[in-house]
Amino acid sequence: MELQVVGANALTVSETTFGREFNEALIHQVVVAYAAGARQGSRAQKTRAEVSGSGKKPWRQKGTGRARSGDIKSPIWRSGGVTFAAKPQDHSQKVNKKMYRGAIKSILSELVRQDRLVVVEKFEIDAPKTKVLVQKLKDMALTDALIITASLDENLFLAARNLYKVDVRDVQAIDPVSLIAFDKVVVTVDAVKQIEEMFA
C-alpha cells in the first residue's frame, strides 16, 4: 500500500503495519494496561493499629451514661484509623509484546483510514521558538498534533514544550495513548521507515 507524502511522491509501506483491521478490544486492553502502569500507587492510610495514641480505655464501661468505648483510635472516632485502609500497590498489568505491537499497528492503520496520519518529507524548525512552530503548524492547518520524528529534534522539542495540544516524540517514545490522544499525527518519512522496522 502507499501513503501520500505532503509535497512529495507517495511512500510504499507494509500492509501489515499500516493496513491492519481495527481491533477495538485489543486497543482498549492495551490502553487500559498502559494507563494502569502509569499509576503511582503510593497512597497509604493508617489502620486503627497504626494510628499513634494511647491504648487506654477512654472511660469505664458502665455508669457514665455515654456510649461504651474501648479505644480512641476506633475508626468511628474523629482522628481514628481507617476501616479498610488503602495501602501502596502495583497497578501494572502484563501485556504480551505481540499484543502491544498489534495494538500499535491497529491504531496506525485506523489513523490512515481516518486521514489523521500526515506524512511529511521532514519536519524541522531553525530555532527553538514556539512562535515559529505555531506558524509552521498553522501553514499546515494543524492545531492539535503529535509530531513523530526519527530522532528527537531539540529545537522542535523545546518549541512544543508549552503548547497544550502539540507534542513531539521520536519513534522510540511513541505509545498507544499518545497516538490516539491527538487529532492529527504528523510523521516524517524516516520515522515511517523506523516504525516499519520496529513493528514488522
UniProtKB/Swiss-Prot annotation:
Q: Where is this region: Disordered?
A: 43-71
Sorted alphabetically, the Gene Ontology BP terms of this entry are:
translation
The alphabetized UniProt keywords are: Ribonucleoprotein, Ribosomal protein, RNA-binding, rRNA-binding
Give the top-rank taxon of the lineage listed in the UniProt record for this protein: Bacteria
List the record's Gene Ontology CC terms alphabetically.
ribonucleoprotein complex; ribosome
Q: Does the keyword Nucleotidyltransferase apply?
A: no
Q: Which InterPro entries match?
A: Ribosomal_uL4 (IPR002136), Ribosomal_uL4-like (IPR013005), Ribosomal_uL4_dom_sf (IPR023574)
Indicate yes or no for the key word Kinase. Answer: no
Disulfide pattern? none
Q: What does this protein do?
A: One of the primary rRNA binding proteins, this protein initially binds near the 5'-end of the 23S rRNA. It is important during the early stages of 50S assembly. It makes multiple contacts with different domains of the 23S rRNA in the assembled 50S subunit and ribosome.
What does the sequence similarity comment in the record state about its family?
Belongs to the universal ribosomal protein uL4 family.
State what protein this is by name. Answer: Large ribosomal subunit protein uL4
Q: Which gene encodes it?
A: rplD
